[in-house]
Amino acid sequence: MKQLYGVIGNPIGHSLSPVMHNDAFEHLNMDAHYHAFLVKEEVLGEAVRGLKALGISGFNVTTPHKVAIMDYLDEIDPLAKQIGAVNTVVHKDGKLIGYNTDGIGFVRALQSISSKPLQEKRILLLGAGGASRAIYFSLADVGVKEIDVANRTVDKAKELITACKATVHSVALSLEKATEEQGNYDIIIQTTTIGMHPRVEHTPLQISSLNKGTIVSDIIYNPFETKILCEAKEQGAMIQNGIDMFVYQGALAFEMWTGRTPNIERMKQLVIRKLGG
């Protein structure tokens, strides 16, 4: 019988997940289908119960349901609980189990371009919202010891640092201070929406004094190269946009559901083509 997977959100028509996952199913000769479900906030509970009753094998969760979904699940993975958001649900033994692959997917993507283990790196996170939280906790979970957080509101950066129970050395910085200190970091990760289309001329941090070999990663993928990435490239940094994070988090969800490993590069090239790259 064909296995059913999907993604729930509102809006959902723009999602590239169905294209990516259905291509992977076809490539691996699997009898499965991935569908995008438009689910409004007021019917989230009914939708989740309906998906469970239909026997869905697993599904992704996107805006605006990543936090609210937690009330309707049977179990939640400890890391997802710590992050406070779920983006992947596995239906196993009659239970819906929630995970967060955003942060771990990002960590895998980052490690794929780093010549040394991330545990040896000093990292600066720009932003203190939901994406930053997922990445911070996931970096801490794999043993990264130095992660500073810069945010427009420094108190919010302090809150994020305080919430993490792992033994991480962290300092909360203003964006102005982070601009001054940028040369002290091996990796800079941009997690805000600043620089996203259509406001492409904006940047949270003016890149001016990076060390050779610094990695600058931006979770935005529209445009492919944000202003911060363009400036970093001019300084000789290695850059990475948000496509890698999107693909790796999707691949991790695919592995959780099926026990199979999809072709990451195939997924990435498909997404780039769909985005017009």
Swiss-Prot record:
E.C. number(s) listed in UniProt: 1.1.1.25
UniProt cross-references to SUPFAM superfamilies, sorted A to Z: Aminoacid dehydrogenase-like, N-terminal domain, NAD(P)-binding Rossmann-fold domains
The entry's keywords: Amino-acid biosynthesis, Aromatic amino acid biosynthesis, NADP, Oxidoreductase
Binding site for shikimate: 15-17, 62, 87, 102, 221
GO biological-process terms attached to the record: amino acid biosynthetic process; aromatic amino acid family biosynthetic process; chorismate biosynthetic process; shikimate metabolic process
Catalysed conversion reaction: shikimate + NADP(+) = 3-dehydroshikimate + NADPH + H(+)
Keyword Glycoprotein: no
Recorded metabolic or biological pathway in which this protein acts: Metabolic intermediate biosynthesis; chorismate biosynthesis; chorismate from D-erythrose 4-phosphate and phosphoenolpyruvate: step 4/7
GO cellular component: cytosol
One Pfam family in the UniProt entry: Shikimate_dh_N
Active site: 66
MF terms in GO: NADP binding; shikimate 3-dehydrogenase (NADP+) activity
Residues annotated for NADP(+) binding in this entry: 127-131, 151-156, 219, 242
Annotated InterPro entries: Aminoacid_DH-like_N_sf (IPR046346), NAD(P)-bd_dom_sf (IPR036291), SDH_C (IPR041121), Shikimate_DH (IPR011342), Shikimate_DH-bd_N (IPR013708), Shikimate_DH_fam (IPR022893), Shikm_DH/Glu-tRNA_Rdtase (IPR006151)
Role description: Involved in the biosynthesis of the chorismate, which leads to the biosynthesis of aromatic amino acids. Catalyzes the reversible NADPH linked reduction of 3-dehydroshikimate (DHSA) to yield shikimate (SA).
Assembly and interaction partners: Homodimer.
Database matches in HAMAP family: Shikimate_DH_AroE
Family classification: Belongs to the shikimate dehydrogenase family.
Protein name: Shikimate dehydrogenase (NADP(+))
Gene: aroE
